[in-house]
């Protein structure tokens, strides 16, 4: 399989040697959706990676620009040039978004925020690494009736392995998807195709792929950790490849957090570590008896707990996110930390002892409906604020908080994550100073405005369960 280009020259050679006819220019919008424009490959030359392509109408992208300042430029990132293996003679490349007219980088380009975060941490003498675990569902079909909301809305999920399936084959019972072998696991072949494509064409190193806890085709793919912007790029690629391979098979992949009631939702647990530039893990202390965690590591946790409610608006950014973040489904609800407690927002993995390179934290609230460029940048900034202010995270909580009395939770001063998107947005609106060295006011305000509009719109529609519950009122 073709190797990934390392520079502009190799990217141009890549187009020639692979007989590429079309190139997909891809970028991420403010809400985390991957967008694209396709151009002829013969438009690429030596200047393309310096001048870019004036192809984007920014007024057509939510949260970008208005119609009177809509001309924008997409600047290709040569190291991201790859084949699209399910299309003949087509390549794709990720791009940076610039204002037209030579006015510089577009301040609401999410990838630009990730680059600013990397620059900011470098100025502080740090390097960070991120390793997200992406969960998702692959359904056979989803029927949605929302075109005439006045007469009612609804949806139906078809899944060959779900308890409600009528296919006559094996089913996976609720919460028993972790880890039955095939043929009970009926989606191993599609996961293998996804991870093989990621490795062969997109430069991934895969660490694991497996069925997840939920029925109806829930899976997880874990790839090797990397630096902030590169990891966010890989999240977008993984979602893109997964959706396309499912679609090619006549199925549908979704990264929404909670597509149906009664089973676990999909998260994006994010592993994070902070290092010096000369390769020392700042979170590791072999003399710490509890978790081999350093004082700096505790300060990072303190920052994440301090700003956890505000972070929710970025890491759990949809109304559906808060149907996942409820007790009973292995999702975090409480802003505490622990060595192995999966009801806590922050977990310190304890697979190994005495291994500096493996010391990290796992931040559990994020889900894959989020914008990874903003998520990883916000996690970094909260952690750095914890270091700067020496925020004490308090003692770890190792018992199941779901079973803890309200009185005990109050005595331990345990705070909960927001219970809704509205609540999370209010928290972000009042607590965002820690983000401002990297998140400019333009992107913060645009994000808040878009998400408030989204939350308000969702509140207008009666829910099918409301009909069930209140029809006899």
Curated annotation (Swiss-Prot):
What are the entry keywords? Answer: ATP-binding, Cytoplasm, Ligase, Magnesium, Manganese, Metal-binding, Nucleotide-binding, Phosphoprotein
* E.C. number: 6.3.1.2
Which cofactor does this sequence's record say it needs? Mg(2+); Mn(2+)
- Keyword Nucleus among UniProt keywords: no
Residues of the signal sequence? none
General remark:
GlnA of S.acidocaldarius is unique among the archeal glutamine synthetase since the regulatory properties suggest a position within the GS I-alpha subgroup. However, the sequence shows more pronounced similarities to the GS I-beta subgroup.
Q: Can you name this protein?
A: Glutamine synthetase
Recorded name of the encoding gene: glnA
